[in-house]
Amino acid sequence: MTPIIGISTNLHTVDKGKFLGMERIYVNKDYIDAVVKAGGIPLLLPPVADRASIVRYAEVCDGFILSGGGDINPILYGDFPHPCLEEFHTGLDRAQWALTEEILRTDKPLLAICRGIQLLNVVLGGTLWQDITAIGHPVMLHSQYSPREDIFHPVSIEKDS
């Protein structure tokens, strides 16, 4: 049977034009394309506060991707916002936090990318460097302007992880 892969979505407030102030739910198309290419069925999971919906997401999906996105509100992991932070949506953070907890209860496969791995970290009790350059030594470029399919850094995947 073809696996259904739930993909967390993000929130953007329109900042110009006809729909100024409207909130949009989105995910980058790359996530959808990758799931389809791997033989899965992508299912976008809008952020909801309703516990019953979150539980149902976890039941329906065979695996999950916590997608990349904006900054997580540092208040949620016991810190104060650094001046370098971009916009954040605490409601989105709380909804994705609850989704992540439910995914962890299911023990189903989970791939967390960028914001997703940061979210997983704080849900499990970790903290974050809000400004990666503040750690005091050179770091790799984290926002590339080259084509997305270009390789920028190695990734090691542990067997059975």
Regions inferred by a protein language model and the residue ranges of each:
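N-terminal beta1-alpha1 cap of cysteine-dependent amidohydrolase-like domains
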Residues: M1-L111, V122-W129, T133-D160
